[in-house]
A protein has these predicted regions:
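S-adenosyl-L-methionine
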Residues: 62-83
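Short beta-strand element of Class I
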Residues: 56-60
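Conserved SAM-binding loop of SAM-dependent methyltransferases across substrates and taxa
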Residues: 43-55
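Class I SAM-dependent transferase core
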Residues: 1-37, 71-74, 78
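A generic "cationic amphipathic patch" detector
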Residues: 37, 49-52, 63, 72
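Conserved S-adenosyl-L-methionine
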Residues: 40
Length: 83
């Protein structure tokens, strides 16, 4: 499922733009049960969009900035990808 930039909650942290997410996710060749580790997850856009292609998979988002963690949680909840 493609997610547009404007659909994500954004902060001053950098966000991977939708065109870059689309190419990156396509190159990962994810399977429905893949496991993705997103190091330096920022606002969580790559992991959250990737999760839409992995219904039985898992995404682990790692981010050192507290504001980033809060934003990842908001975005994950918004797209029902938080467990």
């Amino acid at each position: 499922m493609h997610i547009y930039d404007k659909e994500f909650t954004q902060t001053e942290l950098p966000m991977t733009k939708q065109e870059i997410r689309a190419v990156s996710i396509a190159k990962l060749m994810l399977k429905p049960n893949s496991i993705l580790i997103d190091v330096g997850a920022g606002t969580g856009t790559i992991g959250i969009e990737a999760a839409t292609y992995m219904p039985q998979g898992k995404v682990y988002a790692i981010e050192k900035e507290e504001k980033g963690l809060d934003t990842i949680k908001l975005n994950a909840e918004k797209f029902n990808k938080f467990r």
